[in-house]
UniProtKB/Swiss-Prot annotation:
The RNAP catalytic core consists of 2 alpha, 1 beta, 1 beta' and 1 omega subunit. When a sigma factor is associated with the core the holoenzyme is formed, which can initiate transcription. GO terms for cellular component: DNA-directed RNA polymerase complex. GO terms for biological process: DNA-templated transcription. The keyword Nucleotidyltransferase applies. This is DNA-directed RNA polymerase subunit omega.
Length: 93
């Protein structure tokens, strides 16, 4: 079982409340969205991995925000391309 002290993570983020929000967002990315961990997994749960990433300075609220904005842009571009393909198909008929 991994033991993680959160003091380093708190120091990286600024306060424990924001650290919890950042860790939860990152753990959700790893567990649900299938994002790859930036540290060795070592059979740890996503929450522990998220805390280790925060401790090392690999994850901040800003990096998570930027990643989410990029994901939204990619999703919107895919939707626009799909609509354009459908419209072209209708025009060809």
């Amino acid at each position: 079982m991994a033991r993680v002290t959160v003091e380093d993570a708190v120091n990286q983020i600024g306060n424990r409340f924001d650290m919890i929000l950042v860790a939860a967002r990152r753990a959700r990315q790893i567990a649900v969205q299938g994002k790859d961990p930036m540290v060795e997994e070592e059979n740890d749960k996503p929450t522990v991995i998220a805390l280790r990433e925060i401790e090392l300075g690999l994850v901040t609220a800003d990096t998570l925000d930027a990643d989410e904005r990029q994901t939204v842009r990619e999703r919107e571009a895919a939707e626009i391309a799909a609509v354009a393909a459908i419209a072209e198909g209708r025009n060809a008929i």
